[in-house]
Amino acid sequence: MMNSSQFSDSQTTSLHRIPTFYCCYLLQSINKKQSFYIGSTPNPVRRLRQHNGNLSNGGAYRTKREGTRPWEMVLVVYGFTSKIAALQFEHAWQHGYKTHYIPMDDRIMKNANSGRTVHHKLGLVRQLLANVYFRHMNLKVHFFSMPILDVWNLNKFNIKMGSNEISVDVSQVSQETKTNLEQASDDDDDNGACSRDERNLQLVTELYDNTVTKENEIKEIIKDILVLGERNCNLCGQCYDYTSEDDTMKMHIFICPNSTCHYEAHLNCLYEKFIEEESGIDSKNILLPNFCMCPGCLDEMSWSDFVKISTMIKNSFSN
């Protein structure tokens, strides 16, 4: 994550933008239950189709092995602040026995040949999410399979998350029936497996499309405010103007997307406010805010949410 000093508005270099969607995912073979695959992608719909051979290009050698197709995407971890961060999580997830993100004494995988069960796969996710590096990204875990969610809730290795609250969700269709994706697996014919594969793709598509749609809606809300011209930071009062030809007026700002709020302030001002508030509670030196609320509507948001909206504004509307 970035801190206040990294949001210099005099920068002329290419600006980093937090991706709309970037995830790490876990695949499970429908026909071979003990076969799993871990990967990462900015587009889980396209990637799942590649793994299942629906697209001619892409996929992975391991997911092409005889008898393993079709695959279903049983969970995704998403909300990464960059492609690099997602790749780091993916590599650590694949190599839990040696990753520096998990202390050696706490590792549930002891060597390269261990940790092949789904309990280990999900246990590693818990351990990685507890690491301070990933914790500040406010990552979310989304399940497309109720049995896999049940394994998560079982928490076989009793992994403690500390005070870190992880956003865990499950596709709505899965909530309506615990056998939504599993019913077809009771049938031994190919049609049953195919039906389950297609249903899973629908669930993945819904999550991805909803995330993209939500960001586009936020863009439109913010655009309607920015076109009004000169605006003022609600904290320091300094002007900014995204309609100006003067790039120095196009500072890193945050605008609350809440339809009843639209609080606006410089990202630096918000950073200083949140750090000061948390420093008053905890005497330790704090580099990144942990608990943030929009000063206008008091909606709880993570610091990464503030940064994501601010960098989206800077990248989308500064030209």
Swiss-Prot record:
InterPro entries: GIY-YIG_endonuc, GIY-YIG_endonuc_sf, Slx1, SLX1_C, SLX1_endonuclease, Znf_RING/FYVE/PHD. GO terms for biological process: DNA-templated DNA replication; double-strand break repair via homologous recombination. GO terms for cellular component: Slx1-Slx4 complex. A zinc finger (SLX1-type) spans 233-297. SMART domains: GIYc. The keyword DNA repair applies. Its cofactor is a divalent metal cation. Its EC number is 3.1.-.-. Residues 20-103 form the GIY-YIG domain. Its main location: nucleus. One of its GO terms (molecular function) is 5'-flap endonuclease activity. Transmembrane segments: none annotated. It is found in: Nucleus. The keyword GTP-binding does not apply. Keywords: DNA damage, DNA recombination, DNA repair, Endonuclease, Hydrolase, Metal-binding, Nuclease, Nucleus, Zinc, Zinc-finger. It comes from the Eukaryota. Disulfide bonds: none annotated. Catalytic subunit of the SLX1-SLX4 structure-specific endonuclease that resolves DNA secondary structures generated during DNA repair and recombination. Has endonuclease activity towards branched DNA substrates, introducing single-strand cuts in duplex DNA close to junctions with ss-DNA. Forms a heterodimer with SLX4. Belongs to the SLX1 family. This is Structure-specific endonuclease subunit SLX1. It comes from Vanderwaltozyma polyspora (strain ATCC 22028 / DSM 70294 / BCRC 21397 / CBS 2163 / NBRC 10782 / NRRL Y-8283 / UCD 57-17).
